[in-house]
C-alpha cells in the first residue's frame, strides 16, 4: 500500500477540486492510501460531495496554508501550514511521497529546508513529462523553474537523475539525452553550454544525442532534455499556451458554420485523439528531482484532470522506487 500526503490547499481552484480528483483517481488504485493535509472542515465538506472509502484516507488538519501570493519566508513563519506539514510527513517517512499545488517558490524553499538535497546535488530541478509527435513516446524536460541558473555539475546531475527515472518509470532501456540549445552544432551556444556538451559527450553512462533546438522538443527525437530552469520554464509555458490556443482555434474554425460543423463530425475522433495527446493537463505535474524524498508539484491552476495526472505520476514514481535508485546512482 502506497501512502501519499496530498496538500489540498493553496492552489488557485481550491481544495474541492483536489478532493474530487483524489476521489476519482483512487478508484483505479487499490494500493493507494491518501493523507489529506489542510483545513479539516473544507476537506470534510468536499468529501461529502466526493466520497472516498474511509479506510483509504486520513486527514492531517492544519490551521494555515501558503497562498500563491506568499513568500519563501512563509515556510518559516507558517509552521502549521499544509505545505510544511506535508513535507514534514515525508521527511519523517510517514508517507512515501507528497503532492502540492501551492506556491512554487515556497515549495522549493520548503523542500530545501525540510527535506534537504541528495548527495552531490546542490540545485534540484523540476521535471515534467511532455507528449511528443511519436506515438506512445514521452519526453522528460528539466529544469523547468526550480532554479533560474545552473552550472555544469547541475546539468550533469539532472541528466543522471532523469536517466534513472526514464529507465525505471518510462521503461526506456537506454534513454537518449539532449542539451537544449540554439542550434544542433557542437559549436553553438554559450561557453557554459559548450562545456556541458563536452561533459555529457564524454560520460560513458549517458547516451548523448547532442544539442536539440526548442522547435524539436515535442518531435520525439530524444527521451530527456536538460537545460537551466529559466530556459526550461519559458519553453514549458510556451508549449502550454500554444497548445491551449491552437486547440481553441481549431475548435472555433470547425464549428464556425453549419457546413463546417457537419464536416467536423467526420473529424471528431481524430481531433479528440490529437487534443487528448497534446493537452498539457493530461501530463500535469513535475517531480522535484534532487531532494531527499519523492515530492511532486501540481500546476497552480490545476483542475480535476490535472490533479489526477499528478497523482498518477506520483504513484508511478513510488511504485518504481525511483528515489532509492537515483540515490544509488549518485553515490
UniProtKB/Swiss-Prot annotation:
Subcellular locations according to the entry: Cytoplasm
UniProt keyword terms in alphabetical order: Cytoplasm, Lipid biosynthesis, Lipid metabolism, Phospholipid biosynthesis, Phospholipid metabolism, Transferase
Listed EC numbers: 2.3.1.274
Biological processes annotated in GO: fatty acid biosynthetic process; phospholipid biosynthetic process
Keyword DNA-binding: no
Gene Ontology CC entries for this record: cytoplasm
The keyword Lipid metabolism is assigned to this record: yes
The protein's role, per its UniProt record: Catalyzes the reversible formation of acyl-phosphate (acyl-PO(4)) from acyl-[acyl-carrier-protein] (acyl-ACP). This enzyme utilizes acyl-ACP as fatty acyl donor, but not acyl-CoA.
Family membership: Belongs to the PlsX family.
Protein name, entry field: Phosphate acyltransferase
Species of the source: Mesoplasma florum (strain ATCC 33453 / NBRC 100688 / NCTC 11704 / L1)
Lineage: Bacteria, Bacillati, Mycoplasmatota, Mollicutes, Entomoplasmatales
Gene (UniProt): plsX
Amino acid at each position: 500500500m502506497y501512502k501519499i500526503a496530498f496538500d489540498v490547499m493553496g492552489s488557485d481552484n481550491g481544495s474541492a477540486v483536489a478532493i474530487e480528483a483524489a476521489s476519482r483517481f483512487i478508484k483505479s488504485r487499490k494500493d493507494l492510501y491518501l493523507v489529506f493535509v489542510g483545513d479539516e472542515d473544507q476537506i470534510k465538506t468536499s468529501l461529502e460531495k466526493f466520497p472516498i472509502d474511509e479506510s483509504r484516507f486520513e486527514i492531517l488538519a492544519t490551521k494555515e496554508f501558503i497562498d500563491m501570493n506568499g513568500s519563501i519566508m512563509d515556510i518559516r513563519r507558517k509552521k502549521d501550514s499544509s505545505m510544511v506539514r506535508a513535507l514534514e510527513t515525508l521527511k519523517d517517512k510517514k508517507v512515501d511521497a507528497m503532492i502540492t499545488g501551492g506556491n512554487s517558490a515556497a515549495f522549493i524553499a520548503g523542500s530545501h529546508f525540510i527535506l534537504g538535497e541528495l548527495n552531490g546535488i546542490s540545485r534540484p530541478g523540476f521535471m515534467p513529462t511532455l507528449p511528443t509527435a511519436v506515438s506512445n513516446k514521452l519526453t522528460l524536460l528539466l529544469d523547468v523553474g526550480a532554479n533560474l541558473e545552473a552550472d555544469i555539475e547541475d546539468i550533469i546531475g539532472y541528466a543522471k537523475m532523469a536517466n534513472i527515472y526514464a529507465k525505471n518509470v518510462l521503461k526506456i532501456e537506454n534513454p537518449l539525452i539532449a542539451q537544449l540549445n540554439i542550434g544542433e552544432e557542437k559549436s553553438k551556444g554559450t561557453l557554459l553550454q559548450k562545456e556541458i556538451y563536452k561533459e555529457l559527450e564524454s560520460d560513458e553512462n549517458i547516451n548523448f544525442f547532442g544539442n536539440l533546438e526548442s522547435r524539436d522538443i515535442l518531435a520525439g527525437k530524444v527521451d530527456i532534455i536538460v537545460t537551466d530552469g529559466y530556459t526550461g520554464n519559458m519553453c514549458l509555458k510556451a508549449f502550454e499556451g500554444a497548445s491551449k490556443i491552437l486547440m481553441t482555434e481549431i475548435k472555433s474554425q470547425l464549428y464556425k458554420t453549419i457546413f463546417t460543423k457537419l464536416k467536423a463530425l467526420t473529424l471528431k475522433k481524430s481531433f479528440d485523439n490529437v487534443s487528448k495527446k497534446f493537452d498539457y493537463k493530461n501530463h500535469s505535474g513535475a517531480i522535484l528531482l534532487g531532494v531527499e524524498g519523492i515530492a511532486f508539484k501540481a500546476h497552480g491552476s490545476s483542475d480535476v484532470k490535472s490533479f489526477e495526472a499528478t497523482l498518477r505520476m506520483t504513484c508511478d514514481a513510488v511504485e518504481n522506487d525511483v528515489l532509492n535508485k537515483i540515490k544509488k546512482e549518485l553515490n
